[in-house]
Amino acid sequence: MIKPYTISTQMWLEHEDDNLGLNGSFVDFRVNVDSIDGYWVESPEEIVLIIRGTAYYIENEAPILHFLSEFFNPMRL
C-alpha cells in the first residue's frame, strides 16, 4: 500500500452524561492511514473500515485523543 493515505470523516460526539444521544454534535477529523486491516458492509450507504493510523481533530491539528480528553475521562477511553 502506498502511503500516506488520508481519510476525512465525521464522528458524533455526545456528552458523557447524555444517555439518549440527543445532546451532541458532529466533529470533523482526519485520519492519516497506515493500513486498512479490514472492512464490512453495514448497508449500501454505510461501510465500516478497520483502520490503523493516527487521527487528528481538523480545526486545530491536535491528536484526536487529546481533543476527546477534554470531553471524557481519559482513563475510560
List where the protein language model places each region:
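Acidic, Ser/Thr- and proline-rich intrinsically disordered linker/docking segments
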Residues: M1-V31, S35-L77
